[in-house]
Amino acid sequence: MTDTKKTLFSAPTDEQLDTLTLTIESNLVPSISELEAIAKDWKTLGLQEADFTANAIKIAWFCYHSGSSESVQVQGNSTSDKIPLYQLAGVVRQHSTLRRFCRYFAKVIWNYALRKNQPPANWASQNYKEADRFAAFDFFEGVSSSAALSPPGGLIREPSPNERMANETNKNVHLYQTASRGSNLATTSTVATKGAYSTNASNAGFPYHRPE
């Protein structure tokens, strides 16, 4: 088996690696082909190519304040009076997810928000501390992704360790709250739930044995 592996694949030298064209591809953001498909459909709707970036930023800015989940309803105006912003967002959703799309522009949004001193509108309701309020958006990880679009001059500043921790913690809390709404308990009685949200009996106060 070992000999077969060595025959099929061998460790390349630095010189061999240098001959390869390796681009950054990440499933956190849309692929080039997905972005091209979005642009093509926007053009079919009548949007001018010169306005593509402005409208992408408009979508990402809305989601910065309102979230980019599957259930969010994008509102606002595009640069065209004939095309509402939700219609452009609908095209995005045909080829990718809104969150992946927004991640691609996260660095641009981050810089703009810092420059204008505009944290996400719902930072307080999400229980962020004031010091970490600029991290209170759900595509925050795009700010640190090398696959995201980099603004001229780079980031105004990198996210702080506390901001990263606050966002990750809030993400886990949100996932837990979402899962708890789908609890698999057959009753809502507090005798069973102990007053706690849970998707399994152990977290609700019952012993739970994972199936073999």
UniProtKB/Swiss-Prot annotation:
Disulfide bonds: none annotated. It is found in: Virion. Belongs to the potexvirus capsid protein family. InterPro entries: Pltvir_coat (IPR000052). Pfam families: Flexi_CP (PF00286). GO terms for cellular component: helical viral capsid; ribonucleoprotein complex. It comes from Clover yellow mosaic virus. This is Coat protein. GO terms for molecular function: structural molecule activity. Keywords: Capsid protein, Helical capsid protein, Ribonucleoprotein, Virion. Required for genome encapsidation. Forms ribonucleoprotein complexes along with TGB1 helicase and viral RNA. The keyword Nucleotide-binding does not apply.
